[in-house]
UniProtKB/Swiss-Prot annotation:
The modification Pros-8alpha-FAD histidine is found at H54. GO terms for cellular component: endoplasmic reticulum membrane. Keywords: Ascorbate biosynthesis, Endoplasmic reticulum, FAD, Flavoprotein, Membrane, Microsome, Oxidoreductase, Transmembrane, Transmembrane helix. Pathway: Cofactor biosynthesis; L-ascorbate biosynthesis via UDP-alpha-D-glucuronate pathway; L-ascorbate from UDP-alpha-D-glucuronate: step 4/4. It is an enzyme of class 1 (oxidoreductase). This is L-gulonolactone oxidase. SUPFAM superfamilies: FAD-binding/transporter-associated domain-like.
Amino acid sequence: MVHGYKGVQFQNWAKTYGCSPEVYYQPTSVEEVREVLALAREQKKKVKVVGGGHSPSDIACTDGFMIHMGKMNRVLQVDKEKKQITVEAGILLADLHPQLDEHGLAMSNLGAVSDVTVAGVIGSGTHNTGIKHGILATQVVALTLMTADGEVLECSESRNADVFQAARVHLGCLGIILTVTLQCVPQFHLQETSFPSTLKEVLDNLDSHLKRSEYFRFLWFPHTENVSIIYQDHTNKAPSSASNWFWDYAIGFYLLEFLLWTSTYLPCLVGWINRFFFWMLFNCKKESSNLSHKIFTYECRFKQHVQDWAIPREKTKEALLELKAMLEAHPKVVAHYPVEVRFTRGDDILLSPCFQRDSCYMNIIMYRPYGKDVPRLDYWLAYETIMKKFGGRPHWAKAHNCTQKDFEEMYPTFHKFCDIREKLDPTGMFLNSYLEKVFY
């Protein structure tokens, strides 16, 4: 019989959200997952699955049963001919990468963080950049899902296709993902080239940049005109690195954290900090190359609050200039660097922020120096207002203030997803306070 633990305290990576589940489970098999759900039905408990805990929101929180899938983390099958790999849903991407390397395979695109589970990555709509590439869930070709009553559904474009269309971005509310089959590509290396520019230049030449680099993104430094452009493209060059402990850590982390903490008492310093660190760290061309997963991912050093919305790609310039104008018109509203701007191909996944449109993701951030929260409400609300104006949809893993009414307007297939959810989980076993705001 599966054993649960009481008294476990859950906190997300940034320590911005947490909860105290009544019982915490770490199942090792499908049967143990089924046992937990049977107990939940019997005791009328809510159930939430947690992965790597990196979501900067309360999407995984519950005061009921919490299931951590970390012990269901095996590679089940590798099909070298089709270049597909089937894994248990609790495997971390950080553990999957070396196993893909062994087989000469890779994922075609990855987010910035690898200490996250496969099920969590797809369920939250995790993305990176590259207008020819979709969110990570578009790499899923099949999955298995256990519903609230313990039934296991095999889902793909040819089996339970309606559930598959919903479950690739499942929000943790359709059931428990057990296995995932990913479409991979041959192993490849990337060269990353970063160089300074201006906001005017990058916005005026956006189409050119998107054509020039397969994985293009840029960082805008609020309260300035400064931009760092980042290209990532296939290469045959030997691995090389531009990293340097003094600049990356002594300056880019320890000094920055101290100055950001100081700015909590003197907010007028934030604009100066953004300019200073652009000129210190981003004002010259840098190049590095390595295996793709080592270029796509990087170390997130700062605890932080973030928002990340997807707007239609053609609205990028207008929306970013409006955000800039808002900050200029309200000098008491301060914004940490960077505003990270990325691009993603449209898809047909029911609750994908990129549903039926190529998208621009505009990520804003406020750091928590030494764990201290920085006033951000005015910045957050102004940003959300601008994103809604331009047809934005929020990243599911990141905090937002949207409700059911908003999502009905944002997603033409919202009610179709709701119908599937209610069919698979008629009692709402997999709901929590975050999801109740979404669906009710």
